[in-house]
Structure formats: structure tokens, C-alpha cells
Design a protein with these regions (language model features):
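Walker A (P-loop) ATP-phosphate-binding motif of ABC ATPase nucleotide-binding domains
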Residues: 2
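P-loop (Walker A) phosphate-binding loop of NTP-binding proteins
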Residues: 8
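Hydrophobic positions on the alpha1 helix immediately C-terminal to the Walker A/P-loop
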Residues: 16
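ATP-dependent small-molecule kinase phosphotransfer cores
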Residues: 27-86, 99-100, 111-116, 126-128
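Small-molecule kinase domains that catalyze NTP-dependent phosphoryl transfer to phosphate-bearing small molecules
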Residues: 114-143
Length: 143
């Protein structure tokens, strides 16, 4: 069984995907922008800005996630677009969270000021939604 778990930044995609993987014993596939940025030796936020202008980054990331998932009979794929890009998923889960909860989770993970995290999260949401519509014709605000 292939399980796809998606949600906006800070919704708990990684947390829930990890828990589902542990409970089921299925391998976790959670290859993200952070991983791709690390591979290329680029700061995460700089990499996000690059992706705003270069659709090939999203396309590569999503292609690699799907390839990893399709190599497994059973797996958990956690990513922002997993429920859309892994068409072969047997179960698709979309996580939602209020902006306040998401910002608090991101703040806990990344530190800095709460105000800064709020500003970055709003900006990231806008940019992600715009990119997903442009690249895939996906509206991640209406599930």
C-alpha cells in the first residue's frame, strides 16, 4: 500500500508521515526542498527563492519522490504535493492547520522571532500556491 500525506508548511507532514511509517512498518519517503538544497550545498531559504523562478526544481523534486515511491510496494510519501503527484497512492491524506498553529510549529522547529516566522509562512504559502497553480494547475487551498 502506498500512502500519500500532504499539507501546507507546518501542518505536520513530516511528523504524521513518520508516525504512520513507524506504525505500519512501511518505509518513509520524505525527500524535500531541504534535502535537495543540502545536496546542492545551498541555503534552504535561498533555494526556495530559486524555485520561485525555476520550475525545474519543483519538477525534479516531485519526479524523484514519485520514483522513490514507485520503487516500493509499500511506503509512506510525505510531501506538500504527494496526494497529487503520486497518482498510484492507495490512500491520500491531506493535513490542515490554522495559520497560528502552523507558525507556532515552524517557530518551535526553526527558532527566531514569532513575528518573523509568521511573515515567512504567509509569504511561503502565497509563493507555493502560485507555483503549484502555474506548474501543475493545482490549487492547494481548496481540497
Amino acid at each position: 500500500m502506498r500512502i500519500a500525506i500532504s499539507g501546507r508548511s507546518g501542518c505536520g507532514n513530516t511528523t504524521v508521515s513518520t508516525l504512520v511509517s513507524q506504525i505500519t512498518g512501511y518505509p518513509l519517503i520524505n525527500f524535500t526542498f531541504r534535502n535537495l538544497a543540502e545536496e546542492r550545498g545551498i541555503d534552504f531559504w535561498t533555494f526556495c527563492k530559486m524555485a520561485e523562478r525555476d520550475d525545474s526544481i519543483d519538477l525534479e523534486l516531485d519526479r524523484r519522490q514519485v520514483e522513490m515511491a514507485m520503487e516500493q510496494k509499500n511506503c509512506v510519501l510525505g510531501s506538500r504535493l504527494a496526494i497529487w503527484v503520486l497518482k498510484e497512492a492507495d490512500l491520500k491524506v491531506y493535513l490542515e492547520g490554522s495559520l497560528e498553529v502552523r507558525v507556532a510549529r515552524i517557530h518551535e522547529r526553526e527558532g527566531g522571532s514569532l513575528e518573523e516566522r509568521l511573515k515567512e509562512t504567509k509569504r511561503r504559502d502565497r509563493k507555493d500556491t502560485k507555483r503549484y497553480k502555474r506548474i501543475y494547475s493545482i490549487d492547494n487551498t481548496e481540497i
